[in-house]
């Protein structure tokens, strides 16, 4: 049995299955290996396809890389991330209905950029689903104002929820701009358990305005 080690992860990376990203699974894996990442969370808007493709490829070419495949789901109130689900979850449902469906599938719920009012953060609606939430994205590298991340950390502390960090990468240079360190064995079940137990710590660097411009261009001309 593998022993616990400090693992390094970026829990929020998009692929070309999102209309505002150009990242391919093989690029993501290559960059993760270059950065010494042990864990990546790969999500797309409304789809688990990119995460599934990345996970399957990693099993062939990067067996020591743990890939969490997931979906960033738009609800009527804002966005959530669901990891560890077996199928796409429909978008634009009520927030509680979406969370119930994620949990029915055995999913792990993360609140991405919850207080970023520019990017479908849940804001005060997050309070309604605390009982469903497994982790809060305490640092999102694409968040433009520091107070949005500070408010996410504050919310996590007030509600006794663990934090993770995600770059929200849509392009290569963004991968690894936010990092989660977690003491765990290198498998998904152990990592999820360790995060829930408060064994994760976060750090990150803001990626600035340029990625948002690239995202706009990508969506406009794709």
What kind of feature is each model-predicted range?
Residues 8, 64, 104-110, 114:
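Short beta-strand/loop segments at the ligand-binding rim of alpha/beta enzyme cores
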Residues 1-31, 49-57, 61-62, 69, ...:
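Charged catalytic cores and adjacent phosphate/nucleic-acid-binding surfaces used
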Residues 28-47, 108-110:
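Divalent metal-dependent hydrolysis catalytic cores, especially in the metallo-beta-lactamase
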Residues 34-36, 104, 158:
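Residues at the C-terminal ends
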Residues 37, 65, 107, 161:
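Short glycine/serine/threonine/alanine-rich loop segments
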Residues 41, 67-69, 110-112, 163-165:
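General beta-strand structural signal in soluble alpha/beta enzymes
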């Amino acid at each position: 049995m593998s022993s616990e080690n400090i693992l390094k992860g970026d829990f929020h990376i998009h692929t070309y299955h999102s209309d505002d990203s150009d990242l391919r699974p093989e690029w993501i894996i290559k960059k993760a290996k270059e950065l010494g990442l042990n864990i990546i969370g790969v999500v797309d808007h409304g789809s688990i396809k990119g995460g599934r493709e990345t996970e399957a490829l990693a099993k062939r070419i990067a067996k020591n890389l743990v890939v969490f495949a997931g979906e960033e789901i738009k609800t009527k109130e804002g966005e959530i991330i669901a990891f560890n689900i077996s199928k796409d979850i429909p978008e634009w449902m009520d927030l509680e209905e979406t969370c119930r469906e994620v949990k029915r599938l055995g999913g792990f719920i993360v609140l991405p950029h919850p207080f970023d009012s520019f990017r479908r953060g849940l804001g005060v609606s997050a309070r309604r689903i605390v009982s469903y939430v497994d982790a809060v994205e305490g640092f999102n590298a694409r968040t433009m104002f520091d107070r949005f991340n500070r408010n996410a950390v504050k919310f996590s502390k007030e509600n006794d929820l663990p934090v993770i960090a995600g770059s929200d990468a849509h392009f290569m240079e963004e991968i690894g701009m936010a990092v989660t360190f977690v003491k765990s064995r290198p498998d998904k079940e152990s990592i999820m358990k360790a995060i829930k137990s408060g064994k994760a710590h976060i750090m990150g660097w803001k990626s600035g305005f340029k990625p948002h411009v690239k995202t706009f261009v990508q969506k406009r001309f794709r």
